Structure formats: structure tokens, C-alpha cells
Amino acid sequence: MIQQERLLKVLRAPHVSEKATNNTEKSNTIVFKVALDANKVEIANAVEQLFEVKVDSVRTVVVKGKTKRRGAKMGQRSDWKKAYVTLQEGQSLDFVEGAAE
């Protein structure tokens, strides 16, 4: 069992984009920004315990930070990890419930 403190650090935020919204509607997949050191088991456990839903599968991808320039200085944005969490049939998770009102 993962400690409650670690569960809260694994999931950073829901990732909201056009592609993520289409995935939610078509395949019941929610996209999260997660900790870079989090693994699939931790992500699945965190979603199940925090949102009380059943997870079917988890896919992850590390998004590389873009190189940015400000004047003569070059810098790089931080890398971050994105997790595609597919929920089991009949399960749903709605972040914008009541926001349209």
C-alpha cells in the first residue's frame, strides 16, 4: 500500500487539451501530469484511491522540455511526464462537472 503523502505527490494535475478531451469522450481515458519518478503501478493506485474509480490500464510518456531563447540567453524548460489512464467500463471521472453552470 502506498502512503497517502506519496499518493498526493504522484498526480500533479489533469492535462487538459483538445486531444485529451477527445480521448475522454471516445475511449474513457483521462490524461494526467504526473511526477517524473512515478511508475504505472503508483499512478493506477493513486487514481483508484483518490477518485474511487477502477483503472483498466496506464500508459506513460516523458515529454521533453523545449529549448527556449530570451535575448542572447538560451534555456530549457523542464521535462515532465504524462499518463494516459484508461478507466474500466462503466467508470467515469468528470473534472468540469458543474463548471458550465
Curated annotation (Swiss-Prot):
Recorded GO CC terms: ribonucleoprotein complex; ribosome
Quaternary organization: Part of the 50S ribosomal subunit. Contacts protein L29, and trigger factor when it is bound to the ribosome.
Domain of life per record: Bacteria
Alphabetic keyword roster: Ribonucleoprotein, Ribosomal protein, RNA-binding, rRNA-binding
Species: Histophilus somni (strain 129Pt) (Haemophilus somnus)
Any one GO biological process: translation
A matching Pfam family: Ribosomal_L23
Homology family: Belongs to the universal ribosomal protein uL23 family.
HAMAP family: Ribosomal_uL23_B
Gene3D superfamilies for this protein: 3.30.70.330
Upper lineage: Bacteria, Pseudomonadati, Pseudomonadota, Gammaproteobacteria, Pasteurellales
MF term (GO), any: rRNA binding
Cited function: One of the early assembly proteins it binds 23S rRNA. One of the proteins that surrounds the polypeptide exit tunnel on the outside of the ribosome. Forms the main docking site for trigger factor binding to the ribosome.
Name of this protein: Large ribosomal subunit protein uL23
Matching PANTHER family: 60S RIBOSOMAL PROTEIN L23A
Xref: InterPro entries: Nucleotide-bd_a/b_plait_sf (IPR012677), Ribosomal_uL23-like (IPR013025), Ribosomal_uL23/eL15/eS24_sf (IPR012678), Ribosomal_uL23_CS (IPR001014)
